[in-house]
């Protein structure tokens, strides 16, 4: 018989940087999960992607065991990395802070496609371009 699920926890943690400090510790502690065990497993799985923010969905079972699934980094983080920026514009309609090329958008869309709700690569590219516009990043053709 399958284990009974008691909850899901969604977090965004730096790759290889999970530790018991907030926000990870309190979120896992509320569900009774072994915090250090999660941190060790997460850090081992994500150490190759150092420096990126990794979304993770943790499934917690009644016996306090857990499984987790890592997702691709958020589009905003990937766009900032490609554009070489620290953060997006506070006023994207007025202040443009950087540029990315169509090729860079396509590369990000290919990486994000499994996590996006798009039928094809073109739809995924449109979503990435919308994120870029909302951050004050200009797309060069």
Swiss-Prot record:
GO biological process annotation, one example: translation
GO cellular component: cytosolic large ribosomal subunit
Domain of life: Bacteria
SUPFAM superfamilies in the cross-refs: Ribosomal L11/L12e N-terminal domain, Ribosomal protein L11, C-terminal domain
Pfam families membership: Ribosomal_L11 (PF00298), Ribosomal_L11_N (PF03946)
Gene Ontology MF terms: large ribosomal subunit rRNA binding; structural constituent of ribosome
Keyword rRNA-binding: yes
InterPro entries documented for this protein: Ribosomal_uL11 (IPR000911), Ribosomal_uL11_bac-typ (IPR006519), Ribosomal_uL11_C (IPR020783), Ribosomal_uL11_C_sf (IPR036769), Ribosomal_uL11_N (IPR020784), Ribosomal_uL11_N_sf (IPR036796)
Post-translational modification: One or more lysine residues are methylated.
CDD domains associated with the record: Ribosomal_L11 (cd00349)
Sorted UniProt keywords: Methylation, Ribonucleoprotein, Ribosomal protein, RNA-binding, rRNA-binding
Reported function: Forms part of the ribosomal stalk which helps the ribosome interact with GTP-bound translation factors.
Assembly notes: Part of the ribosomal stalk of the 50S ribosomal subunit. Interacts with L10 and the large rRNA to form the base of the stalk. L10 forms an elongated spine to which L12 dimers bind in a sequential fashion forming a multimeric L10(L12)X complex.
UniProt record similarity statement: Belongs to the universal ribosomal protein uL11 family.
Protein name in the entry: Large ribosomal subunit protein uL11
Organism: Chlorobium phaeovibrioides (strain DSM 265 / 1930) (Prosthecochloris vibrioformis (strain DSM 265))
Taxon lineage: Bacteria, Pseudomonadati, Chlorobiota, Chlorobiia, Chlorobiales
Primary gene name: rplK
């Amino acid at each position: 018989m399958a284990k009974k699920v008691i909850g899901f926890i969604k977090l965004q943690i730096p790759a290889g940087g999970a530790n018991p400090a907030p926000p990870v510790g309190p979120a896992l502690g509320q569900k009774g999960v072994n915090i250090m065990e999660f941190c060790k497993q997460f850090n081992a799985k994500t150490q190759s992607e150092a420096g990126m923010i990794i979304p993770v969905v943790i499934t917690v079972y009644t016996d306090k065991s857990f499984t987790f699934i890592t997702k691709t980094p958020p589009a905003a983080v990937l766009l900032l990395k490609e554009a070489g920026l620290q953060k997006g514009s506070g006023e994207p309609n007025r202040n443009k802070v950087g540029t990315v090329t169509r090729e860079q958008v396509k590369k990000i869309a290919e990486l994000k496609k499994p996590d996006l709700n798009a039928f094809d690569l073109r739809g995924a590219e449109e979503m990435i371009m919308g994120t870029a516009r909302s951050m004050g990043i200009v797309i060069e053709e």
